[in-house]
Amino acid sequence: MDIGDAAGNPMVRNALGDSFPASPEVTLRLCREAGIDEYSHVLHLGAGVGTVCQLLIEKFGCKATGVVLVEPLLQHCTYEDERVQYLHSKMTDLPFDQGIFTHVLIECRCVTQPDLEAVFLTAKTMLEPGGKLIVNEPIILSKSSLPRILGRMIGDTRLNEVVHQRTAMEIGIEIANAEFEILHSQSEPEVTQRLLNKMNQVSMLMKMALRFSSFDPYSEAFPFTKKELLKAFDEFKSALDDETFGWHSWLAAPN
């Protein structure tokens, strides 16, 4: 099962829910606070399989355009309304005219971007006058470090090319460097708790499936044992519980 198949699987989507790993309630609250209404056109950078775009048009009656970063996910995007569309593109090379969106939404995608300032500068060009940037991201606590096995997995594999963990202050600085004024910023413990609850729900099933499956991490060029994978899963849960990992949101407008 590749990433597209997993994301499009009804059982996976039912278990994880819309806007995973974020919270749909928090996403809707942030969008409401940003002034999204039936006249808005939202650009969602990193749209996954489109559940958030669908959520927005159903709740606010707006238009939504989702940029999908992983091309195989396009076939699983949720098309249920003519007000929503999706396309595959990089976050820093968007095929749109400038200044045509009222809002740009980024959730849990900054962590995958090595040049975050470039992402925010691109987002700025997409916004019409008076437009708003909404960012909702996982963060690592200042002066904290990754758990032992999880840190090894990221440091010793290609994960270090795609995971760029930042503190809330570091993301805020990148937003400001792109010449945005930060209108509001706050921690989002509801997202962290929801993610922890989801992981607890699937923990036993995942552990049983991994233990009894024929999957061999080494055969996938991933130099860790099943036991270490399970330990990393538990480390991640503990890091959420003790707030080593958290969630933070920003609302910003171009200067």
Q: Model segments located where?
A:
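Class I SAM-dependent methyltransferase SAM/SAH-binding core
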Residues: 49-93
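A short glycine-rich, Lys/Arg-flanked "PGG" loop and its adjoining helix->strand segment in the class I
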Residues: 117-132
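Conserved class I S-adenosyl-L-methionine
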Residues: 134-156
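Short alpha-helix
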Residues: 163-179
